[in-house]
């Protein structure tokens, strides 16, 4: 990470896409995408996804590391080009507890991530706990971040400290996605970004963390990009001009969250304007969902009814029977909720792919299509971009390859933004 930031600060139009997903096919797609490029790949876990209690994936930080390393080994991707990050590490999961208890758990969370070899750590203590006022005083946020930083510094060995980096600050949306429709997005004011940096500098120095300050590489801000279930707010460079100018005077860059679904040109403009770390998550699993849905349509054309996976029906049954991950986010009317379940840009379906019934039906779908030849016309009908790549000779038409390449469509847009010589 430090090398990428140094090159950006030296004037190079370079950034990095942060892959925020625990889905094995998404991780495989990212590693295969940069297998021969020489680029580093940044894969991040969030605190609610992976923590010392298992998170919603059931994985502790060391488990997630081993999970990613296992995929890297299968792909042949060298570990030294892998960067593991932890996102929103702090009291996020324990906001309903008193601050003292939540911070104790947050310290253990940080220790678990650093001990497991995660080298990019987002120190986020911005959320109010059960006995806190709302919003929290910025100095309280910074002092709590310093407590977390101290835990990281005490856990890391000397070799780890060579690679250890911190990200501070937070964006407006809560981690995990918008629960309501967005009308507009407030771009972070440069005075607020400056205050974030200043309060953290004071708090770190109070705690004797002068050396750790040199490891702070980025500040999370809102540059004016967001999406909800049905709409996207696209980057408007002129609205973020003052914010973009301020960071030039510091040794840091910005980290932008919720950059999913922006255009290729927007990613290039964001990196140019010093939002050099671009986080993406739902857009990757949305592409995965599109691929599964497309393959299901092909299956309907090629496989007899009694042999089909029924994957789309199984997804509906599971999500309607177990609505915990989508109910409070999607519209209450039945017909509208079904559209959201299938096609919402926030892609709450991503929480259901590990479900045993859904996983088995996806496996059957792929097995069914592996046993037949996929006609080019059928691929053109349901996956036209992949058909073009087949025609160019850069893709072979297996179900697995089609899924991977569909996910990589998203990564191609980020590469355009993050790599100066990509046309």
From Swiss-Prot:
Keywords: Galactitol metabolism. One of its GO terms (cellular component) is plasma membrane. It holds the Pfam family GatZ_KbaZ-like. One of its GO terms (biological process) is phosphoenolpyruvate-dependent sugar phosphotransferase system. Pathway: Carbohydrate metabolism; D-tagatose 6-phosphate degradation; D-glyceraldehyde 3-phosphate and glycerone phosphate from D-tagatose 6-phosphate: step 2/2. InterPro entries: Aldolase_TIM, GatZ/KbaZ-like, GatZ_KbaZ_carbometab, TagBP_ald_GatZ. PANTHER family: D-TAGATOSE-1,6-BISPHOSPHATE ALDOLASE SUBUNIT GATZ, N-ACETYLGALACTOSAMINE PERMEASE II COMPONENT-RELATED. Forms a complex with GatY. Belongs to the GatZ/KbaZ family. GatZ subfamily. HAMAP family: Tagatose_aldol_GatZ. Component of the tagatose-1,6-bisphosphate aldolase GatYZ that is required for full activity and stability of the Y subunit. Could have a chaperone-like function for the proper and stable folding of GatY. When expressed alone, GatZ does not show any aldolase activity. Is involved in the catabolism of galactitol. This is D-tagatose-1,6-bisphosphate aldolase subunit GatZ. It comes from Salmonella heidelberg (strain SL476). The lineage of its organism: Bacteria, Pseudomonadati, Pseudomonadota, Gammaproteobacteria, Enterobacterales. The gene is gatZ.
